[in-house]
Every structure is written in C-alpha cells, then in structure tokens.
Amino acid sequence: MAEAASISQGIAERYATALFELSKETGALKTLETDIDALKDVLAGSPDLGAMIASPVISRGDQAKAVAAIAGKMGLSPLMTNTLALMSEKRRLFALPQVLSALAGLIAEEKGEVTAEVTAATKLSAAQAKKLAETLKAKVGKTVKLNTTVDESLIGGLIVKLGSTMIDTSVKSKLASLQNAMKEVG
C-alpha cells in the first residue's frame, strides 16, 4: 500500500511541477492559485466527484466529458482545463488531490510562505488566527498560512504542525501526560 502511495505521489509531483513551471512562464500563477482553491473546494464538497476520479471502472471518455463539463462550469483556466483533460486521457485523475496539494506547496514556496496545520478544540476567531499566524511568522521568518480544523476531543488548546515541528498545547495531551505520570508513580 505504501508503494501505491509513493507512485501516486511521484505522478502528482511531475504533473504539479509541469503545471507550475508553465504557469510561472506565462505569468499565470495567481490564476493557477485560484484554480487550485476552487478545485479543492469542489473535491471537498462532492464525494461523487472524488469517487468518479478514483474509479477505474469509469471509462476515459466518460471521465474526460465529466472533467470538461466541470472545468467549463467552474471557469477554470485553459492550462488547468488542458491538464485535467490530459490526466483523464492518461487515467491519472486519481492523483488529482495530490497534484493540487503539491501545486499549493510549490506556489507557497515561490511566495515565501509556509503552511501550518492547526487543530483546535473550537473554531478560531479571525483575531486568534491572525495572532497565531503573526506569532508563527516571528518564529520562522516567513509568511504563515493556516489550515485549521476543529477537533472537539482536544477539550481545549491547539496542536500546530509546521514542517517537521509539532507543538501540542491541548488539554487532551496534558491529561494524557498526567495519566502516564500517575501510572509511573503508583
């Protein structure tokens, strides 16, 4: 299974690099970024679309028609539309989520940004998110973009993952540490 994941990641990185370089050459990085965000939103909101791109049962022709219709309806750039058509023709649409993630990473790197994965017990307010982004920016020296998710099981606090660093200030982890300490004592 790990081998399949690395194969699809390799495919995704090749498509992402090619699309990124072409967009950079033509000065269309902002358009590409808009397309990526739109596609991520559509994939997140449509389990049927996710199933369609992952299904080996659906023919190339049907996938190509569906992708062309979706791209047209969304108003995606010609470069993204052509890339989706090529991926459909080559039966590589299953790697689309990884392509989008790799593209977002390349664009962020180009802009000097890093992305922090933040898991909070409750939804962060705009002021809290801004303060956290500023604090992380001071720490890493780059603009920080936050991807936030809510996990009520944390009880309180945050878990921040930035690159290979993880900061866990959640009540859940504090309670687990206390529980382990109590087991050692008694």
Curated annotation (Swiss-Prot):
Subcellular localization(s) per the UniProt record: Cell inner membrane
Signal peptide start and end residues: none
One CC-aspect GO term: proton-transporting ATP synthase complex
InterPro entries per record: ATP_synth_OSCP/delta_N_sf, ATPase_OSCP/d_CS, ATPase_OSCP/dsu
GO MF term list: proton-transporting ATP synthase activity, rotational mechanism
Keywords carried by this UniProt record: ATP synthesis, Cell inner membrane, Cell membrane, CF(1), Hydrogen ion transport, Ion transport, Membrane, Transport
Top-rank taxon: Bacteria
Keyword flag NAD: no
Pfam families listed in its UniProt record: OSCP
Topology class, membrane: Peripheral membrane protein
Primary role: F(1)F(0) ATP synthase produces ATP from ADP in the presence of a proton or sodium gradient. F-type ATPases consist of two structural domains, F(1) containing the extramembraneous catalytic core and F(0) containing the membrane proton channel, linked together by a central stalk and a peripheral stalk. During catalysis, ATP synthesis in the catalytic domain of F(1) is coupled via a rotary mechanism of the central stalk subunits to proton translocation. This protein is part of the stalk that links CF(0) to CF(1). It either transmits conformational changes from CF(0) to CF(1) or is implicated in proton conduction.
Family: Belongs to the ATPase delta chain family.
PANTHER family the UniProt entry points to: ATP SYNTHASE DELTA CHAIN (PTHR11910)
HAMAP family in the cross-refs: ATP_synth_delta_bact
Assembly and oligomerization: F-type ATPases have 2 components, F(1) - the catalytic core - and F(0) - the membrane proton channel. F(1) has five subunits: alpha(3), beta(3), gamma(1), delta(1), epsilon(1). F(0) has three main subunits: a(1), b(2) and c(10-14). The alpha and beta chains form an alternating ring which encloses part of the gamma chain. F(1) is attached to F(0) by a central stalk formed by the gamma and epsilon chains, while a peripheral stalk is formed by the delta and b chains.
Protein name from the UniProt record: ATP synthase subunit delta
Organism: Fuscovulum blasticum
Gene that produces this protein: atpH
